Design a protein with these regions (language model features):
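Secretory targeting and sorting signals
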Residues: 1-39
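Catalytic domains of cell-wall/extracellular-matrix polysaccharide-remodeling enzymes
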Residues: 143, 190-302, 307-310
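N-terminal low-complexity, Pro/Thr-rich disordered segments
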Residues: 32-119
Length: 310
């Protein structure tokens, strides 16, 4: 409280009154414990100090969080060991509050493509992250679902109905585990060799199938073999496609293949692989994941979820 000095001619006659008022105020403040609070705000809210209930609650909460993080870390170490990973996968950073602006990669343009879905192989980011995508759906390995769930590795699926239709349940299980199911056409045909209407049946027909069996029309589309033309992108846009992610690298159980001359990963690169097994590969899908994660982790990258950025 600041005491304002009175003018001299009123000072004498009011001094006694002022003193009396001050005495009452000071006594009231002492009795009430200064209800306004030591920080000067109404209500007396302030940071708890040691020995008071608020401080104990904060300490307990911090300890509980530390225990939770320790359990999570132990579970990740155990999962990496269980699935034969030499190193524990690195954790991806939190997704951006605003998704980056995606544009078509230079050299991948089509005439009049300014308003068409962008075609790209890398997501613009400075984070050391990459994205794992799997195409077609031919191999339906239950071990893959368990492995990816326990390792907490995000991935995206691009499905073709002609190899998915014999077991929609497998992909419903995958979707329930947080995987986004995207469009890879009905029959995996070479799109530039088809008429516009034939392409429409392939692309929009797959949109209809995915909505019917999985409850959602995708916004991401990958053309078979990575081949497309202007009609492909115009048709895709007409049935709800917003972006066309291709790939910067392809993963196999025994090696990696690279698009770029330096044969390396870069921030935001998209990795392609397929739903395949030992009939087609020298190894299983689990072997392929081990290869991917060794490459990614050794190079200091984490796997992030594509749909958080696109």
């Amino acid at each position: 409280m600041q005491l304002v000095r009175q003018k001299e001619k009123f000072a004498t006659k009011r001094r006694g009154t002022v003193c009396a008022v001050l005495a009452v105020l000071m006594a009231g403040a002492a009795a009430s414990g200064c209800a306004a609070g030591e920080d000067g705000r109404a209500g007396g809210s302030r940071e708890p100090v040691a020995g008071r209930p608020g401080a104990a609650a904060q300490k307990d909460a911090a300890a509980a969080e530390a225990r939770r993080l320790k359990r999570e870390q132990a579970a990740r170490v155990a999962a990496a060991r269980k699935w034969g990973l030499a190193k524990m996968p690195l954790a991806a950073p939190a997704p951006p509050a605003v998704k980056p602006r995606i544009t078509t990669r230079e050299g991948f343009e089509v005439e009049g493509g300014e308003t068409l879905p962008p075609v790209f192989t890398t997501v613009p980011t400075k984070e050391r992250i990459v994205f794992l995508t799997m195409d077609d759906g031919a191999e339906k390995d239950p071990e893959l679902l368990r492995m990816m769930t326990e390792l907490k590795i995000p991935y995206s699926a691009f499905l073709s109905d002609y190899v998915v239709s014999d077991d929609y349940g497998y992909f419903k299980d995958m979707q329930a585990r947080g995987v986004t199911l995207n469009n890879h056409t009905l029959n995996h045909r070479y799109l530039p060799g088809l008429s516009k209407e034939e392409q429409r049946r392939e692309i929009c027909g797959e949109q209809d199938k995915l909505e019917k069996y999985f409850g959602k029309r995708p916004t991401l589309f990958r053309p078979p073999y990575g081949n497309y033309n202007g009609d492909t992108l115009r048709v895709a846009r007409s049935c709800g496609i917003k972006a066309v992610p291709l790939w910067a690298a392809e993963a196999f159980p025994d090696h990696m293949e690279w698009r770029e001359w330096d044969q390396d990963l870069h921030p935001g690169d998209i990795i392609l692989t397929h739903f395949r097994g030992e009939e087609d590969w020298e190894g299983s899908m689990a072997d392929m994941i081990r290869r991917v994660m060794k490459t990614v982790t050794d190079k200091g990258y984490a796997v992030a979820r594509l749909e958080d950025y696109v």
